[in-house]
Amino acid sequence: MNFEIQAHRGARGIGPRNTLESFRRALAAGVTNLELDVGLSRDGVVIVSHERAATRLECTGAHVGKLWKDLELDQIRTLERGTGDRFTTLDEVLQLVQPHGVGLVIEAKVDPLRPNETAPAAELAQRIVDTVEARGLVSRCVVQSFDWRVIVESRWLCPELRTTALATQSTVRPGSAWTAGLPVRSRNPFNGELVALAFLAGAHAIGPHHHGVNPKLIREAHAAAMRVLPWTVNRRWTMHALIDLGVDGIVTDRPGRLRDVLAVRDFELPLPVADEFARAA
């Protein structure tokens, strides 16, 4: 498998995050995967957004301040984003990538500490799986989350669907509600326990913050046939350092910058899908 260039939130460094415009720009830059965040509307549509609600940072309209789970898609479509884009759906992004061979990394935004602010983890996982299966794109999609209940549920619903266990020092620690009931014993799981826990959750890869990546973590992950995909990396020297450590891919807001780093190291690069926005990368 080639080194992964994951365009974070549709490469938010070169376009408005989590919009069809940013996804098109990332495709034009040449990436292996688009990464995006999703939640669930009241009528069961998987929508693309990093937030739990319509916020003034992202949009204006009558429904600002309301949770996605309390709004239907028609109401969400009335929100103005100021970019010419409306909020998009997972299915629309799947349609965008379907002809091009690019993968999709779908982050389920749920929070076990705020269960009343999003749809239940199991329901969101079910809707994601249903949407991906309906497009016949299971082999090109990955589901990931900091809330590992999504990982467990996704694997149960669709065993062939790949998953990534996202992790930070605050979500993987003793007493954590984020690890799907798996007990964390170490106060520094990035030095030994993280890989075993993610493996038990059924993950195919781990997604640590790049500050948590270390040689032991990578050795243990590779010994378990798991990939290491750190986020979110935008500085060239950090990209070089992580590649030297042996990571399997990088999540970045600047895919063009990562391509430059990989090119000088003679990595095989994915072909751009189009060149309309390539200069912006």
Task: List PLM regions with ranges.
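Phosphate-group recognition and catalysis centered on beta-loop-alpha active-site segments
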Residues: M1-A281
